[in-house]
Amino acid sequence: MPRRRVIGQRKILPDPKFGSELLAKFVNILMVDGKKSTAEAIVYTALETLAQRSGKDHLEAFEVALDNVRPTVEVKSRRVGGSTYQVPVEVRPVRRNALAMRWIVDAARKRGDKSMALRLANELSDAVENKGSAVKKREDVHRMAEANKAFAHYRW
């Protein structure tokens, strides 16, 4: 293993329309085959729809949706004496955002609406109202962590 300096994380450029780094990251997660302009168009259309529905500012509604999907704890597998335990660990802030965005995009892709922009808008509006697949995913992860709280002392 090389012992050179640790390379820092790349700085992500904020998105051009709203100037938000979170939104730029979200666009990158949604992007398929390097088609960034298509991903941006989908996200901006979805945010327009979301803002009209919720009556909030675009970014504010997006933040609320993300907040409702962010996990605080998750489980990680840990081998102890030949058996594997699901150990609950706290999620780092950067990973919280990444997981929330990934779950929202995955849930939107699984929906049956016409366009991706509409699917994303519906999933985001569900997340704002604390319902939908992405919120259910977070609750499942929290439930797993709660069920395995007895193994918390195996944290590393």
Swiss-Prot record:
Recorded GO MF terms: rRNA binding; structural constituent of ribosome; tRNA binding
Domain of life from the UniProt record: Bacteria
Signal peptide span: none
Keywords from the UniProt entry: Ribonucleoprotein, Ribosomal protein, RNA-binding, rRNA-binding, tRNA-binding
GO CC term (a single one): small ribosomal subunit
Example of a GO biological process term: translation
HAMAP family tied to this protein: Ribosomal_uS7_B
NCBIfam families: rpsG_bact (TIGR01029)
Homology family: Belongs to the universal ribosomal protein uS7 family.
Its job: One of the primary rRNA binding proteins, it binds directly to 16S rRNA where it nucleates assembly of the head domain of the 30S subunit. Is located at the subunit interface close to the decoding center, probably blocks exit of the E-site tRNA.
Oligomer status and interactors: Part of the 30S ribosomal subunit. Contacts proteins S9 and S11.
Protein name, as recorded: Small ribosomal subunit protein uS7
Organism of this sequence: Serratia proteamaculans (strain 568)
